[in-house]
């Protein structure tokens, strides 16, 4: 029997034992899973039968208050009403519905997944910045603890697995840094962990893998994110060892990222002036966002201690790192235009219009919508879709142009449906080319600045941008947000999230 038929039987009053609890599970589950009611759970909707809605809500709460305890009435209302979406084409009898029992059909393909907490550390400049001596596993532990602190209803013992992205998983961020960070964060030893790598999209990939595992029924609660210290582990790692066959037959697979940006600029007519203007705007938006406190909700401070010389008695100092240190208030078009090209003598890419090398970490708690409901946690966002695409390594910066349509197709959306896009600014040249070739409205891109100003801690960035995009959706009362980036080696990635506030 199909889920919609089982739901109909429930509504028509076929009864067995354990009525109210199972019925509540069916209402929520079918709202989340049945294609006919695919619209997202928790999203407010207008429903004509307000009296019936209130009656049914009160019946269910009366029978099983523990399952709805702590939820405000609006939240209860939205969850339950979603299950009675009238598109199924029949009238619900609340009295019968509250006393029936059905078995959820196995045809229900996937569950909805929500993000209930998403935070990041402030981003430090690599090599000379505040975090230069802070280990990436420590940064990740701070992010994980910060994410858990936002949802005190969740017992860490419920976490099934931790997935962290890291672009250069060696040295201080080797030895399965996800496991090291989870133990450092104080998670129970029973909580497993894994480190994954898709270069610049590793953090976003981690969130997608956690979400899809929950969708498939393999877990209820996961932690996902990313960490990277470019101060400690340089781009390319400590020992670069190219594959000899590729060096002979496809050397462009190892082309430096800066030169790939130059090829994209040359192909699509991206000028030096446009790159510098884009860079300046990134700094201006980031500085304005910091001044307005827009990043306060998504960031967790990093406590630090260090010892400074003080005569015969070294002095120990403790500080708290709270604010991104990449944005420059002193930058200008004149200053940017005076910089030399960094990768090609006649190129357009400079140190000023490229992403900063950075240190940072981010963590997101991902869980099934059913579990969030049971725990009384109001989700921040719904995971909608994720897609990757391969492209020519020598023009890797164009990767998002090919990943974005795939993510939109999976979500059943159009590009015009996306209200906010966090496009990683690996280089101004490639970001401008992506905006141009993908047909993106520039006004929807990086409203609070991007990696040119705020930094790009490689494996952390996708998770960091996820924390940012869902807060911006909340501020704007907008619905859909996207995180997208190019990926070294010739790829693109894109993830779509829906605001539930």
Regions found by a protein language model. Give the residues of each.
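Short hydrophobic alpha-helical segments enriched in small aliphatic residues
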Residues: 10, 19, 28-31, 50, ...
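Conserved active-site "lid/cap" helical segment
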Residues: 100, 104-180, 185, 263-272, ...
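Condensing-enzyme catalytic core mediating Claisen C-C bond formation in acyl metabolism
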Residues: 104-136, 331-398, 402, 409, ...
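N-terminal extracellular/periplasmic Venus flytrap/periplasmic-binding protein-like
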Residues: 120-122, 133, 137-142, 153, ...
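Conserved beta-ketoacyl condensing-enzyme motif
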Residues: 131-244, 254, 299-322, 394-395, ...
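Conserved catalytic cysteine-centered active-site region
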Residues: 166-220, 251-262, 330-356, 437-464, ...
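Active-site-proximal alpha-helical scaffold in enzymes
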Residues: 196-227, 265-295, 363-370, 435, ...
């Amino acid at each position: 029997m199909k889920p919609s038929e089982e739901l109909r039987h429930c509504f028509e009053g076929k009864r067995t034992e354990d009525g109210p609890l199972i019925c509540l599970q069916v209402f929520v589950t079918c709202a989340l899973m049945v294609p006919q009611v695919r619209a997202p759970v928790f999203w407010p909707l207008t429903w004509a039968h307000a009296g019936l809605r209130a009656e049914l809500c009160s019946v269910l709460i009366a029978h099983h208050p523990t399952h709805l305890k702590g939820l405000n009435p609006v939240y209860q209302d939205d969850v339950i009403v979603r299950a009675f979406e009238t598109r199924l084409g029949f009238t619900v009898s609340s009295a019968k519905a509250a006393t029936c029992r059905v078995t959820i059909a196995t045809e229900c393909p996937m569950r909805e997944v929500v993000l209930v907490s998403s935070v990041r550390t402030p981003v430090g400049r690599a090599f000379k910045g505040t975090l230069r001596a802070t280990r990436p596993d420590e940064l990740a532990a701070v992010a994980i603890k910060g994410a858990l602190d936002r949802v005190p209803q969740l017992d860490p013992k419920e976490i099934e697995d931790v997935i962290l992205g890291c672009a250069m998983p060696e040295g201080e961020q080797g030895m399965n840094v996800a496991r090291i960070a989870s133990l450092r964060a104080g998670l129970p030893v029973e909580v497993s962990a894994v480190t994954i790598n898709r270069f610049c999209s590793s953090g976003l990939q981690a969130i997608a893998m956690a979400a899809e595992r929950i969708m498939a029924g393999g877990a209820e609660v996961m932690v996902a994110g990313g960490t990277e210290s470019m101060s400690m582990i340089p781009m390319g790692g400590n020992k670069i060892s190219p594959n000899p066959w590729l060096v002979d037959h496809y050397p462009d697979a190892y082309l430096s990222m800066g030169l790939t940006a130059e090829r994209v600029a040359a192909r699509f007519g991206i000028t030096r002036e446009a790159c510098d203007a884009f860079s300046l705007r990134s700094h201006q938006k980031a500085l304005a966002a910091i001044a307005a406190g827009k990043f306060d909700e998504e960031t967790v401070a990093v406590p630090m201690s260090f010892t400074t010389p003080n005569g015969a008695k070294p002095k120990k100092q403790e500080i708290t790192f709270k604010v991104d240190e990449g944005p420059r208030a002193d930058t200008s078009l004149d200053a940017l235009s005076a910089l030399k090209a960094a990768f090609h003598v006649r190129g357009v890419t400079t140190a000023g219009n490229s992403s900063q090398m950075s240190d940072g970490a981010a963590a997101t708690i991902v869980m099934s919508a059913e579990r969030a409901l049971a725990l009384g946690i109001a989700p921040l966002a719904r995971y909608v879709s994720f897609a990757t695409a391969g492209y020519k390594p020598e023009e890797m910066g164009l990767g998002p142009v090919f990943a974005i349509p795939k993510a939109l197709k999976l979500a059943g959306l159009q590009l015009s449906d996306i209200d906010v896009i966090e496009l990683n600014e690996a280089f101004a040249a490639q970001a401008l080319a992506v905006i141009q070739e993908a047909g993106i409205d520039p006004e929807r891109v990086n409203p609070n600045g991007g990696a040119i100003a705020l930094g790009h801690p490689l494996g952390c960035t996708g998770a960091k941008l996820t924390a940012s995009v869902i807060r911006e959706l909340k501020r704007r009362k907008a619905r859909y947000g996207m995180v997208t980036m190019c990926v070294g080696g010739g790829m693109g990635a894109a993830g779509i999230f829906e605001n539930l506030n």
